[in-house]
């Protein structure tokens, strides 16, 4: 399988059908074999029911993992990583701020340019200044402390990994923000 898309989510019932359709269009247009793994992190809305509907209508491309309560993004990613079968694992948020149209470029960078990890970067943010300013400060500090100088947005949910990266790191607590650093410490270079 070419690509696994892991999508952690909490209360995203309205965006899931559009997100899956968008991903499916991109995958089919590029002839990728793929799976989409939705990890429902204890949603209190009808997200799980929507995932079940997508599973019923998509053949074998949709998988769902359901948490009984909200454990957080790191455990959701970790469980998705454990299930992922694709040679490239892509993560994205379910809120439609990450564009599935970026998947072919992320895939190309992993498979053709030899990167182990590629991170997206939200150049245009649709968040208030009260959120964007602390994010910029966090990213500057994280770059300095981690030594990863060319990563602009540690918090961006859109990332691509070679499968061996996600199979060789443990993500827990709030460590999802530091997956690039964990990968670097595990010996992955590019």
Region annotations inferred by a language model:
Residues 14-18, 45-54:
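Acidic helix N-cap motif at the loop->helix transition within catalytic regions
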Residues 40-49, 96-97:
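A conserved acidic beta->alpha catalytic loop
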Residues 32-43, 65-66:
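Short beta-strand/loop segment that forms part of the nucleotide-sugar
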Residues 53, 63, 67-69, 73-83, ...:
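Acceptor/aglycone-binding surface of glycosyltransferases and processive sugar-polymer synthases
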Residues 67, 92-94:
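Catalytic metal- and UDP-sugar-binding loop of GT-A-like glycosyltransferases, i.e.
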Residues 89:
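Short aromatic/hydrophobic "clamp" motif used to bind/position activated sugar donors
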Residues 12-27:
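Short, well-formed alpha-helical segments that are part of the catalytic scaffolds
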Residues 2-4, 35:
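Cell-envelope/extracellular polymer assembly enzymes that use nucleotide-activated donors
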């Amino acid at each position: 399988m070419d690509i696994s898309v892991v999508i952690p989510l909490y209360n995203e019932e309205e965006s899931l059908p559009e997100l899956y359709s968008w991903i499916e269009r991109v995958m089919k247009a590029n002839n990728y074999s793929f799976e989409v793994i939705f990890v429902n992190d204890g949603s209190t809305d009808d997200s799980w029911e929507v995932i079940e509907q997508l599973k019923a209508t998509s053949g074998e491309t949709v998988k769902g993992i359901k948490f009984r309560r909200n454990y957080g993004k790191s455990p959701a990613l970790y469980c998705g990583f454990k299930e992922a079968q694709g040679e490239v694992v892509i993560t994205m948020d379910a809120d439609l701020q990450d564009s599935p149209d970026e998947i072919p470029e992320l895939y190309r960078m992993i498979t053709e340019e030899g990167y182990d990890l590629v991170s997206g970067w939200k150049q245009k943010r649709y968040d208030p200044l009260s959120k964007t300013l602390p994010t910029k400060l966090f990213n500057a500090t994280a770059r300095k402390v981690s030594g990863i100088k060319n990563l602009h947005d540690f918090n961006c949910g859109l990332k691509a990994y070679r499968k061996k990266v996600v199979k060789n790191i443990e993500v827990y607590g709030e460590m999802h923000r530091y997956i690039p650093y964990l990968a670097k410490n595990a010996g992955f270079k590019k």
